[in-house]
C-alpha cells in the first residue's frame, strides 16, 4: 500500500470515530428539546420551533463563511474551535428558563457548527476517491443512525432525572471531540490550492447550476427536519410518554444498519443520482401526508418507517451529488454553501412547522401541517425534475459516479 493510500485509509478511520462523537453529542440533546420545552414546560411549539430554526439558519446559512475560512487556514483550527463553541452552547442550554436564553444557546451551538461542519465535510471529499465516495457516505449515515438512537436513549434516560444532565453530557462529548481533533487531526489543507476567502465564495456564487441545486433542496429539508420537531411531539402525544421517542430512532437505526449500504450499492449501478434523490423524496412526501390522521402508535411508526426508508434512498445520493458538483479548488466554500438549503429549509421547517402544528390544533385540524408539508414535497420534486431533466439540461452524474 502506497503512503498516499495508507494516509487515506487512516484518515477515513479517523473521520468515522470523529463522526460518531459528533452524532452522539448532538442526539443526546436535540431530540429532547421539543419534549422538554413543549411537553414538560408547556411552551408554545412555535417558540421552540423558532429556536431550532434559528440554529439551523445560523449554522447552515453561514456555512459558506466557515468553509471559506477553512479553505484559507485549514481544517484543524476551525474544527476544534467550533466543537468547543458547540459545547458552550449546550452548557448554556442547561440554564434556559426563558425563550431568549434557549435562542441564545441554540445560536451559540449553531456558530460552533458553522465552524466545524464545512471543513469536516470537505475532508470526506479529500480523503475518498470518487468511485468509493457514495459508499463511504452510506457508512457515515449508518453510523449517524446508530449514533442517533444511542444518543436519544442516553438523553431519554438522563431526562428522567434532570434536563441539566442531558445538556452537560452533550457538552462533555463535544469537549472530548475537540480534544480528539486537537491531538490527532493532521494540519490538512482541504482544497487543492490555498484559496483566498473572497475568491472561494465568489467561485461558488458564480456557479449557477450549483446555486439552483442547493436552493431547490430547501423543500427537501423542510420535510427531513420534522424528525426533530413534529414527529417526536406526535409520538409523545399518542404514547403519552417521552420514552416512546427512543423507539422512533431505534426504527431509523435498524433500517439504516440493515438497508442503507446494500441499497446504495444496488442503486448506484442502476440509477442516476438525481433519480435516487427524487425517488426517496417522493416516498418521504407520501409518508408524511397521512401522519395527522394516525391515531395509534403502530400507525405512526409504520409511516415513520416509510419516511426513513425514503431518507435512506435519498441521502447518500444527495451527498454524493453535492460533492460531484463542487469545484475542488474551493471545496470548503462549496460544502459550506451546500448547507444553505438546509439553513432555509430548517428555518422554515422548524418555525413554520411549529406554527402549523399550533394552528392545526387550535383549528381542530391536526392533519393540516402534514398536508402542507406534502405539498412542499411535491413542489420540490417538480423543481428537481425540471433541473435535471435531460431534455432541458445535461444529466448531472452517471450511475456510480
UniProtKB/Swiss-Prot annotation:
GO cellular component term of the entry, any: plasma membrane
One of the record's GO molecular function terms: transmembrane transporter activity
SUPFAM superfamilies: MFS general substrate transporter
Membrane topology label: Multi-pass membrane protein
Localization: Cell inner membrane
Entries under CDD domains matching the protein: MFS_MdtH_MDR_like
InterPro entries: MFS, MFS_dom, MFS_trans_sf, MFS_Transporters, Multidrug-R_MdtH
Family annotation (Gene3D superfamilies): MFS general substrate transporter like domains (1.20.1250.20)
Keyword field: Cell inner membrane, Cell membrane, Membrane, Transmembrane, Transmembrane helix, Transport
Residue ranges crossing the lipid bilayer per the database entry: 13-33, 34-54, 99-119, 139-159, 165-185, 214-234, 244-264, 277-297, 340-360, 368-388
Protein's UniProt keywords contain Transmembrane helix: yes
Family label: Belongs to the major facilitator superfamily. DHA1 family. MdtH (TC 2.A.1.2.21) subfamily.
Protein's name in the database: Multidrug resistance protein MdtH
Organism: Serratia proteamaculans (strain 568)
Gene assigned in the entry: mdtH
Amino acid at each position: 500500500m502506497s503512503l498516499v493510500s495508507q494516509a487515506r485509509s487512516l484518515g477515513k478511520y479517523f473521520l468515522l470515530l470523529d463522526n460518531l462523537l459528533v452524532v452522539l453529542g448532538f442526539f443526546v440533546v436535540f431530540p429532547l428539546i421539543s419534549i422538554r420545552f413543549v411537553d414538560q414546560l408547556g411552551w408554545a411549539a412555535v417558540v421552540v420551533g423558532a429556536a431550532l430554526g434559528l440554529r439551523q439558519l445560523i449554522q447552515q446559512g453561514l456555512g459558506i463563511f466557515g468553509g471559506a475560512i477553512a479553505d484559507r487556514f485549514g481544517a484543524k483550527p476551525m474544527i476544534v474551535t467550533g466543537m468547543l463553541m458547540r459545547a458552550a452552547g449546550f452548557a448554556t442550554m442547561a440554564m434556559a428558563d426563558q425563550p431568549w436564553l434557549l435562542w441564545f444557546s441554540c445560536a451559540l451551538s449553531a456558530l460552533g457548527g458553522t465552524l466545524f461542519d464545512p471543513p469536516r465535510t470537505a475532508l470526506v471529499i479529500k480523503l475518498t476517491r470518487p468511485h468509493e465516495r457514495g459508499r463511504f457516505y452510506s457508512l457515515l449515515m449508518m453510523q449517524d443512525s446508530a449514533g442517533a438512537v444511542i444518543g436519544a436513549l442516553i438523553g431519554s434516560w438522563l431526562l428522567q432525572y434532570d434536563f441539566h444532565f442531558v445538556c452537560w453530557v452533550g457538552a462533555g462529548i463535544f469537549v472530548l471531540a475537540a480534544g480528539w481533533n486537537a491531538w490527532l487531526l493532521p494540519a490538512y489543507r482541504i482544497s487543492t490550492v490555498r484559496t483566498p476567502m473572497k475568491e472561494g465564495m465568489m467561485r461558488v456564487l458564480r456557479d449557477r447550476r450549483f446555486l439552483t441545486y442547493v436552493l431547490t433542496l430547501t423543500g427537501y429539508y423542510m420535510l427531513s427536519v420534522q424528525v426533530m420537531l413534529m414527529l417526536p411531539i406526535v409520538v409523545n402525544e399518542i404514547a403519552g410518554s417521552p420514552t416512546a421517542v427512543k423507539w422512533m430512532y431505534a426504527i431509523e437505526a435498524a433500517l439504516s444498519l440493515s438497508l442503507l449500504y446494500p441499497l446504495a450499492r444496488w442503486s448506484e449501478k442502476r440509477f442516476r443520482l438525481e433519480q435516487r434523490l427524487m425517488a426517496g423524496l417522493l416516498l418521504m412526501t407520501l409518508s408524511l401526508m397521512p401522519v395527522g390522521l394516525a391515531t395509534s402508535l403502530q400507525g405512526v411508526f409504520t409511516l415513520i418507517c416509510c419516511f426513513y426508508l425514503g431518507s435512506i434512498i435519498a441521502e447518500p445520493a444527495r451527498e454524493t451529488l453535492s460533492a460531484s458538483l463542487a469545484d475542488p479548488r474551493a471545496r470548503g466554500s462549496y460544502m459550506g454553501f451546500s448547507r444553505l438549503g438546509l439553513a432555509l429549509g430548517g428555518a422554515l421547517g422548524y418555525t413554520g412547522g411549529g406554527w402549523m402544528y399550533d394552528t392545526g390544533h387550535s383549528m381542530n385540524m391536526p392533519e393540516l401541517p402534514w398536508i402542507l408539508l406534502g405539498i412542499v414535497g411535491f413542489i420540490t420534486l417538480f423543481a428537481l425534475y425540471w433541473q435535471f431533466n435531460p431534455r432541458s439540461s445535461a444529466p448531472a452524474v452517471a450511475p456510480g459516479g
